[in-house]
Amino acid sequence: MKQSFVKIRKITESPYSDIWAYPKGTKSQIKSRIKELENLGVESILFQGKLEINTINVLGKGYVGIVVLGKIGRKKIAVKIRRNDSPRKNLKKEAELLKIINKLKIGPELIASSKNFLVMEYLDGEKIGDWVGGLKKKGSSSQLKIIIKKVLEDCYLSLIHI
């Protein structure tokens, strides 16, 4: 079955609306977060990913937030949603850190942010842990060393060219 993006305004009923204020939120919180996300320019969401939360597929879930696939116009984006039970009161500090590393050409580009959301460039690809786990053939340790060296060089070069 082909999945399609759903307009944010239509994601107001459980179980999909539960993602806006995970793990538990009031109707008022959900409505407020939908408005907050619309103000950031996000138009639609696609619930896909290998991780499942209460029958809903997402790209990722962590201690602070949940990440889903979204769209602004025709551009796919990653949307980090602050969990209601997060020890952080907002995502402001994380947004500031992303802006700093973006100047060094590191990490996904931060497109927009608010108290409860980070809207970032969507980077499609294999998770690094899965990629490393898949390195079982001859010569893969040297391949891994080359990649790690390149990443570290890129980070260093970005730092000295500020």
Where are these regions (language model features)?
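ATP-binding glycine-rich loop module of kinase domains
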Residues: N57-L91
